[in-house]
Amino acid sequence: MRVPSVTLPLLVGATALAACVSGAPVETGPPNVPEFKPAFAGQTRAEAVATRTPLQVTEIASGFDRPWAIAFLPDRRMLVTEKPTGHLFIVTADGRKSPPVAGIPPVDGRGQGGLLDVELGPDFATSRRIYWTYYEPREGGNGLTVARGRLIDGAQPRIENLQITFRMLPTMESTQHCGGRLVFAPDTTLFVVLGERSIMPGRKQAQDLGSHLGKVVRINPDGSVPRDNPFVNRPGVRPEIWSYGHRNILSAALDARNQLWVVEMGPRGGDELNLVQRAKDYGWPTIGYGEEYSGRPIHRSTQAPGMEQPVYYWDPVIAPSGLTIYSGPLFPEWRGNLLIGGLASQALIRLVLRNNRVVGEERLLTHLHSRIREVVQGPEGALYLLTDESNGKLLKITPR
């Protein structure tokens, strides 16, 4: 059901404008780990910036049980996943929801698991194939799985010709740090981001090239391994691996130069923005900028030879989920900016980049007091968000 829109002015008043001019950061609270210092200027607490365009927030639909992802169909309807139930819906522009799409396999919806991302295949116009990630119940535990199938439209939509194209290994019993975002590259290869399962045996495997845990992997649409992957034909190494040393990535997107950006959740402190490159080690759990939730240390250092530094980090954390790099016509001042959903921060986080460095940060939509799970740019240039709650909402953001 479509409801009346609510218009929210953003960062108005002398204080916000002064912050933009004075160089003060958005985050002014004390860090969790004050002894950890940035490796270079601007790596954290960038200067506050302010969007000049007033924003209008329109609720398109509600009643989702912890929705997780949005993908646009060519006719501007949306696919929306519901995490714990394993339901996939088709939603019209005016908020009408289909019955759950039939043929989605059972999910393990406990904790951070369930039905996660969904994307249209690169050949969707002819094949009608969609791809999705989910936590698959398995003997001995569970694990992230990539599936694809043909979407059959109609009064009772369904999936036909289901195929499993990738299974994260090893299987473990854990409901945390699932990862799960999908990103198709222009060459049709598919990046899949994978968490390290949170538990100690999994955490250690983020540095183990014989494990998929804590990795970004790259596969072909049918699940085969691209011949130019960096670890092909290396004994004992998973050939799908593209990069490693990650903790829990819930945000991933390509920019205009086809660079892969990810935002990953840190522990207590140390959320990271990383520019992912082939064969690189991003350090977890050897280095980082956070600590255990108990306050105990994790890392002896924030730097180590052969390990990449984050482009940016947050302490305290924002709890990032969802990422789009804006390229539309409705918000010219946002072009090339990263827009990140914030769960614990209950905000839409905007980062301004220059030469692959963060030069400005903004927290938007804090008036909503909502955990933002997903951020997607629509075909017309509007932003579409999902709120992470038992009565989750699909919101549309346009200029007022």
Region locations from a protein language model:
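Bacterial N-terminal signal peptides that target proteins for export
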Residues: 1-10
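Bacterial N-terminal signal peptides
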Residues: 9-19
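Acidic, Gly/Ser/Thr-rich repeat motifs that build Ca2+-stabilized beta-propeller blades
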Residues: 21-200, 251-254, 259-266, 316-354, ...
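Surface-exposed loop and turn segments in beta-propeller and other repeat-based domains
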Residues: 99-113, 161-175, 221-242, 285-315, ...
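Beta-propeller blade signature
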Residues: 145-154, 209-221, 276-277
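Acidic/polar, solvent-exposed loop segments in beta-strand-rich repeat domains
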Residues: 200-211
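Repeat-solenoid scaffold signature
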Residues: 237-272, 277
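Conserved blade-ending motifs and adjacent loop-strand segments that build the rim/top face
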Residues: 246, 359-379
